[in-house]
């Protein structure tokens, strides 16, 4: 089995369905004997360019270990799901389990927001 990193972008109006989508794709991988190494929900972020007249979208990253048939099934699911705007699959040399640089940035932004919310207004 090979290691893959999959990033997919979900329509911002469908953000509440993202946890269910993640569970569905995780279920496909595990049902076929694959392994989930990392799941990251990067949240709603600004896109580099407009897609379908949208400036923001919900980003999700999965690091998995599976065979080609499982990967094909996941990618077919992306193609027939109207909520998925784009997806990218990259073959990796080894399993990635540490937080990605993007996730570290998301955590840093969340920490800054919570710090600002706790600070009293002057």
Curated annotation (Swiss-Prot):
One of its GO terms (cellular component) is cytosolic small ribosomal subunit. GO terms for molecular function: small ribosomal subunit rRNA binding; structural constituent of ribosome. Residues 106-122 have a biased composition (Basic and acidic residues). SUPFAM superfamilies: Ribosomal protein S6 (SSF54995). It comes from the Bacteria. Residues 97-122 are annotated as: Disordered. GO terms for biological process: translation. Keywords: Ribonucleoprotein, Ribosomal protein, RNA-binding, rRNA-binding. Binds together with bS18 to 16S ribosomal RNA. Belongs to the bacterial ribosomal protein bS6 family. This is Small ribosomal subunit protein bS6. It comes from Janthinobacterium sp. (strain Marseille) (Minibacterium massiliensis).
